[in-house]
């Protein structure tokens, strides 16, 4: 029996894009209704199927007439680097003038410049600079964000970054998942001693991160310009010893087999994956991993190798989409632009792209049992959009159609102009 007397809020006259795992056409329910109780979705379906004897005039329930708008799950950005010091606009200009990556690095640019600026910044300075980036995503309907470390590259500053990521949750009603990315690059003081740096990552940084409960997962940048397969395995082993889930930056510039390696550890996701091959895809499917597509970096770096979308479809590997917001290769804080790029550059369908920032974004963070879908018992993180069909969220960007944003059942944003 549906105990509607315990409902706090009921949305009526609304179309639902439930985005349930494996659903087609957005999991649409037209002329629907959705009820919230204690921060969870308590009921959803056709408005005509509301429980018998229920009345929308019940004074104990807030009833919201959505006037035919669309409800989706709150959006999820499952791969970002939002916390960092400085910016690299000067390098952008240098690159457009024809300077090579090495020339920029020799001039003090590249990731070294971000590491230097991040180390110099205080927690409050990093918080102040990250907050507008997170605010931009939040105002676009994002309710869950993953934030990585990786610009400190020493124990004090990696810890500082993760603490700032946690503090952001006190500033905005957004769920923050933190990922330790100490193995992002070699700091200049270890430029000729990768194994020595990994000693610090695995034996000093990671135990402290765990002891202070600062991370939900561990990531590694496995690439020719990053860490080798053997070095990546070393970090994975350390993460596994601390019972932390694994993610990996993999197959962005070449195929080292990092996705296959990560699959052996039942990793959450493999991200970038432009050079992923079928063997890696099969391994990901077998272990239940998610493929995270990052079209912003593909665009900003003017890459030409497309991710193997057809093979991912063939083997039914879930595809998430994220901003990869970072100062060097994707200084983009617009989730709707990512939807459009996923469709136009990678040829995802709009329903695949939207699934990528809802149910499969949740899966990439290990949250598939609580977020990313409109389903009974799931967290009431939902977004109301003034659109005529869900594809509009992928079709256009620059105009924000968000009408209301609800986090854990509480309205946190309202845009009367939408």
Curated annotation (Swiss-Prot):
Top enzyme class, one word, equals hydrolase
Offer one Pfam family short name for this entry: Amidohydro_1
Q: Which Gene3D superfamilies match?
A: Metal-dependent hydrolases, Urease, subunit C, domain 1
- Chain positions recorded as N-formimidoyl-L-glutamate binding sites: 151, 326, 328
InterPro entries attached here?
Amidohydro-rel, HutI, Metal-dep_hydrolase_composite, Metal_Hydrolase
GO terms classed as biological process: L-histidine catabolic process to glutamate and formamide; L-histidine catabolic process to glutamate and formate
Q: In which pathway does it act?
A: Amino-acid degradation; L-histidine degradation into L-glutamate; N-formimidoyl-L-glutamate from L-histidine: step 3/3
What residues does Fe(3+) bind to?
A: 79, 81, 249, 324
Look up the record and report any one GO term of the cellular component aspect.
Answer: cytoplasm
Keyword Iron among UniProt keywords:
yes
The record's catalysed reaction(s) read: 4-imidazolone-5-propanoate + H2O = N-formimidoyl-L-glutamate
Q: Which residues bind 4-imidazolone-5-propanoate?
A: 88, 151, 184, 252, 329
Q: How and how many cofactors are bound, per the record note?
A: Binds 1 zinc or iron ion per subunit.
The primary site where this protein sits is cytoplasm
**Cofactor(s) of this protein:** Zn(2+); Fe(3+)
The terms under GO molecular function for this entry are: imidazolonepropionase activity; iron ion binding; zinc ion binding
UniProtKB keywords? Cytoplasm, Histidine metabolism, Hydrolase, Iron, Metal-binding, Zinc
User: Per UniProt, where does Zn(2+) bind?
Assistant: 79, 81, 249, 324
The protein's Enzyme Commission number: 3.5.2.7
Give the family, as the similarity comment puts it: Belongs to the metallo-dependent hydrolases superfamily. HutI family.
- What is the annotated role of this protein in its UniProt record? Catalyzes the hydrolytic cleavage of the carbon-nitrogen bond in imidazolone-5-propanoate to yield N-formimidoyl-L-glutamate. It is the third step in the universal histidine degradation pathway.
List the protein's name.
Imidazolonepropionase
């Amino acid at each position: 029996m549906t105990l509607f007397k315990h409902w706090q809020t009921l949305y009526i006259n609304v179309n639902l894009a439930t985005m349930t795992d494996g659903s087609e056409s957005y999991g649409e329910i037209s002329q629907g209704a959705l009820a919230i109780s204690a921060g969870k979705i308590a009921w959803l379906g056709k408005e005509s199927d509301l429980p018998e004897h229920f009345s929308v005039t019940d004074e104990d329930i807030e009833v919201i007439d959505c006037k035919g708008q669309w409800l989706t799950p709150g959006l999820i950005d499952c791969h970002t680097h939002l916390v960092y010091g400085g910016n690299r606009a000067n390098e952008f200009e240098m690159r457009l003038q024809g300077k090579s990556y090495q020339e920029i690095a020799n001039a003090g640019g590249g990731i070294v410049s971000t590491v230097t600026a991040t180390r110099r910044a205080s927690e409050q300075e990093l918080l102040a600079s990250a907050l507008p980036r997170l605010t931009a995503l939040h105002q676009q309907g994002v309710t869950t964000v993953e934030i990585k470390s990786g610009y400190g590259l020493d124990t004090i500053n990696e810890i500082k970054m993760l603490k700032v990521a946690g503090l952001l949750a006190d500033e905005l009603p957004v769920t923050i998942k933190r990922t330790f990315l100490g193995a992002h690059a070699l700091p200049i003081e270890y430029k000729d001693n990768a194994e020595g740096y990994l000693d610090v990552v695995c034996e000093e940084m990671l135990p402290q991160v765990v002891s202070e409960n600062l991370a939900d997962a561990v990531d590694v940048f496995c690439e020719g310009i990053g860490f080798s397969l053997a070095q990546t395995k070393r970090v994975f082993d350390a993460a596994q010893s601390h019972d932390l889930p694994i993610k990996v930056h993999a197959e962005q510039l070449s195929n080292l087999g990092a996705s296959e390696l990560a699959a052996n550890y039942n990793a959450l996701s493999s991200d970038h994956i432009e050079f992923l091959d079928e063997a890696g895809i099969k391994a990901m499917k077998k272990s239940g991993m998610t493929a995270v597509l990052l079209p912003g970096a593909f665009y900003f770096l003017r890459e030409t190798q497309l991710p193997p979308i057809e093979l991912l479809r063939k083997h039914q590997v879930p595809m998430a989409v994220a901003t990869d917001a970072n100062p060097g290769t994707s200084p983009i804080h617009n989730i709707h632009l990512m939807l459009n790029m996923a469709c136009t550059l990678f040829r995802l369908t709009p329903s695949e792209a939207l699934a990528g920032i809802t149910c499969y974004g949740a899966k990439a963070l290990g949250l598939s049992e609580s977020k990313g879908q409109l389903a009974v018992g799931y967290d009431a993180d939902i977004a109301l959009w003034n659109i005529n069909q869900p594809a509009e969220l992928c079709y256009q960007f620059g105009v924000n159609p968000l009408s209301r944003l609800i986090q854990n059942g509480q309205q946190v944003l309202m845009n009367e102009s939408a």
